[in-house]
């Protein structure tokens, strides 16, 4: 089974269009939603209904219109919602470690025995706009290590995981790593100039 996992960062849509397998994504990614085979909305419905969730008007109706939608529960108000099998996924992974919606897609792909997983639009770029700026933090600072762990777990199980070259996922970033009072730039791997 081949699975494409699509996030919302810029990516080459033609690569996804040419992917031979199921395409999974997020329901709030409305620019590309018509071609997803499965959707995952892991946030609890009571939180999604709050204005602070910043979901657009009619978002709940959108959820009701999706063909295959995984949520925390099979909500009565969302009749097409399928309960995400979190216990089975955790048992399969051996660890209850999810720091993003995308990580739940990876967990499901591993549970279902994917042979190949392609990951597009999932950069989780936690880099500061100005290197060394300690005031900058993003949610990706804790989401990315989780995703990279799941990528490593998948590869350790023999799953072919494709990550586009332009994505920073599972790639070394050699800027801003201090050595005493210096900040050397390592081009390919830590410690090597």
Predicted features along the sequence, with ranges:
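Metal-ion/cofactor- or nucleotide/acyl-coenzyme-handling active-site neighborhoods
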Residues: 1-193
